[in-house]
Amino acid sequence: MHHVWIGIKDEVPSVFGKLHIKLVKVVDEMTFAVGEIISYLDMCAAEGTQLQRGMNFRLKSGRTVVLMSRRSNALYTDAISSDGKVITYEGHDATSGEADIPKMVDQPSNTFKGTLTQNGLFYEAAMETKSSRRPPELVQVYEKLFPGTWVFNGAFHLMNAYQEHDGNRNVFKFVLQLSEKTSGDKEISPDPERPTDRVIPSDVKREVWKRDGGKCVLCGKTDNLHFDHDLPYSLGGTSILVENIQLLCAFHNLSKSNRIQ
C-alpha cells in the first residue's frame, strides 16, 4: 500500500470532472488486493479515517467507500449477482434521532436541514452517470466477514440507483458494477489482460474460513490472507463452490498468480 493522497483537495476545485481523474490515479497506487482479508484497523488506516458508517461518499482522501455485510444479523439487504460482478447495495435508514422506528420510515435523501444524506449523494452521482453527465463514481467495497475481520471485495463503478418498496417503506438500491480494471488486480497480477476477479459469495467465504482454520493452506500463516480461486475463473473455475476457494497468504497467492501467467 502507498499513501499518495497528499494535496488532492488542492488539485480538484470542482465537485465532478477533475476529481474523478485524480481519484483513479490515487486508487491505482494505493489499495488492498481483491479478496484480501484485513482487520478493521487496517481498513481504516488505508482509507485515512475511522469508518463509522456504511456509506462514505468522497472521504477527505477523495475516495468513496461502502461497507457491506451479508451476515444473518445484517441491518440491510445487500445482494451479489450470481456471476460476482454486480453488487446491489441497500441505502441507509434515518437515524434514531430522526425517526422513532427507522425501519418503518422511508430512507431519506435529505436531512431536516435540506442537505443531502449519504443516500442522496450516492443517488445524485448515479443519476449524473445514468444521464451521461459524468463518469461513474469509483467505489471501494469492503465486506464484514466476522467482528473485526473484513474482506476487500474490489473497486466498483456506481452505475445506477433506484427506490423500491420493501413492504414497510421505500428504500434506496445502488447498483455497483465490478470495474474491469480494479485496483486489486494490479497487486495480484501485473498482466492487464487478466480478467477481473469476481466477488466470492459471503456464505462461501465464511465456510472456507472455517474449513481452512483462518490460515494459509500451504504454510499456515494467519496474516495477509486472501481468498483464492483454486482454478481461476478465467480457466473455468467458479466462485460459488467452496471446493474451488482456499485461503492463501500474500506470498503464495502471488507465487501462484505468476505461475499461471
Annotated model-derived regions:
Residues H2-V151:
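Acidic, glycine-rich low-complexity segments with interspersed aromatic residues
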Residues R134-P136, N153, V171, T222:
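Eukaryote-biased feature marking scaffold/signaling PDZ-domain proteins and nuclear chromatin regulators
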Residues V141, V217-L218:
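A structural signal for short, well-ordered beta-strand segments and their strand-loop junctions
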Residues K144-P192:
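Compact mixed alphabeta submodule
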Residues C219-L247, I260:
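Histidine-centered nuclease catalytic patch
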Residues V65-S69, F174-L176, C216:
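Generic recognition of long tandem-repeat/solenoid scaffolds
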Residues A125-M127, K181-K215, S239, E243:
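Short, charged surface segments at domain edges that flank catalytic/cofactor-binding sites
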Residues A250-Q261:
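Long, charge-rich boundary regions
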